[in-house]
């Protein structure tokens, strides 16, 4: 596992929650002796939905809602088996989606 890289992608709607999770992942990886690159903030996806307030007429009266998806990228360089076990057993708060990918 010396030349491998673990690429961790985090997604969440709350930017504070994703930053706390990234910090926890970095601390865990550094405790096991691996080198860490990141967190790299990726572009935020903004989804806007417009709905009519009234049912029949009053088309000028509309309401907009938005949902922002924040993303972070963390690379763990030269991980050991101990690092992989620690990262897979790490508990994250609800609302944070984690994708672990092992690359050569």
Swiss-Prot record:
Key words, A-Z: Ribonucleoprotein, Ribosomal protein
Assembly description: Part of the 30S ribosomal subunit.
Spans traversing the lipid bilayer: none
Source organism of this protein record: Lachnospira eligens (strain ATCC 27750 / DSM 3376 / VPI C15-48 / C15-B4)
Molecular function terms from GO: structural constituent of ribosome; tRNA binding
Keyword Ribonucleoprotein part of the UniProt annotation: yes
Keyword Ribosomal protein attached: yes
PROSITE patterns: RIBOSOMAL_S10 (PS00361)
Name of the protein in its database record: Small ribosomal subunit protein uS10
Role noted for this protein: Involved in the binding of tRNA to the ribosomes.
Family note: Belongs to the universal ribosomal protein uS10 family.
Gene transcribed to yield this protein: rpsJ
GO CC list: ribonucleoprotein complex; ribosome
GO biological process: translation
